[in-house]
């Protein structure tokens, strides 16, 4: 199952950050009113001068910035942001509808391959997608590649579009899966067994 905190858990696991996830069983009016009082992206609170973040991409960047995982320069950071946004668009436009409907065809597969070819070409020019070290951009590429391949395990007639065609993306996958915490989390979440609830 891919949950709304799937990306965060992989990110925090990779960075070795301990975390506690609190989920609500229901959303009451009091909680709704509180959310409405916050800015869509970020809100400075007077009480403890903490920041409240509102969207998953923003939260991922916030975590990454605090762990030097967003690039070493403004140029690299901009590149990271660009890749993260691209991956989220692909997940929202193609991957989630495929998983939720359990329908995939040649046309959708070819569109995904076009994006994968672009990322593969970028990685063929440099070990990492943004700069000379692993960043949030690489993690997002890995997540996109991994969830796509794992879903296609149940659709063998389309898997040939991806098998052994993206060695650089495969290298990223092996890198992140070599992290024990990341590997354990992913192996315990089978996207083929339940519908996706990924919210981006």
Curated annotation (Swiss-Prot):
GO molecular function terms noted in the UniProt entry: glutathione transferase activity
Taxonomy, superkingdom: Eukaryota
UniProt-recorded name of the protein: Glutathione S-transferase domain-containing protein DDB_G0273153/DDB_G0273923
Source lineage: Eukaryota, Amoebozoa, Evosea, Eumycetozoa, Dictyostelia
Signal peptide bounds: none
Any Gene Ontology biological process: glutathione metabolic process
Domain GST N-terminal span(s) in chain numbering: 1-71
Family, as annotated: Belongs to the GST superfamily.
Listed PANTHER family: GLUTATHIONE S-TRANSFERASE (PTHR11571), GLUTATHIONE S-TRANSFERASE DOMAIN-CONTAINING PROTEIN DDB_G0273153_DDB_G0273923 (PTHR11571:SF116)
SUPFAM superfamilies referenced in this protein's UniProt entry, alphabetically: GST C-terminal domain-like
Boundaries of every GST C-terminal domain copy: 73-195
């Amino acid at each position: 199952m891919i949950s709304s905190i799937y990306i965060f858990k992989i990110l925090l696991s990779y960075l070795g950050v301990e975390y506690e996830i609190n989920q609500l069983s229901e959303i009451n009016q009091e909680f709704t009113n509180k959310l409405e009082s916050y800015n869509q992206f970020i809100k400075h609170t007077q009480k403890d001068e903490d920041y409240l973040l509102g969207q998953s991409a923003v939260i991922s960047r916030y975590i990454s910035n605090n762990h030097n995982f967003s690039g070493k320069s403004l140029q690299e950071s901009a590149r990271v942001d660009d890749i993260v946004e691209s991956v989220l668009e692909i997940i929202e436009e193609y991957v989630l509808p495929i998983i939720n409907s359990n329908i995939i065809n040649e046309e959708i597969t070819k569109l995904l391959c076009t994006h994968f070819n672009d990322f593969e070409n970028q990685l063929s020019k440099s070990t990492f997608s943004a700069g000379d070290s692993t960043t949030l951009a690489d993690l997002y590429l890995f997540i996109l590649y991994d969830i796509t391949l794992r879903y296609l395990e149940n659709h063998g007639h389309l898997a040939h579009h991806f098998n052994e065609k993206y060695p650089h993306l495969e290298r990223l996958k092996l890198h992140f899966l070599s992290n024990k915490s990341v590997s354990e989390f992913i192996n315990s979440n089978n996207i083929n067994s339940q519908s996706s609830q990924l919210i981006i």
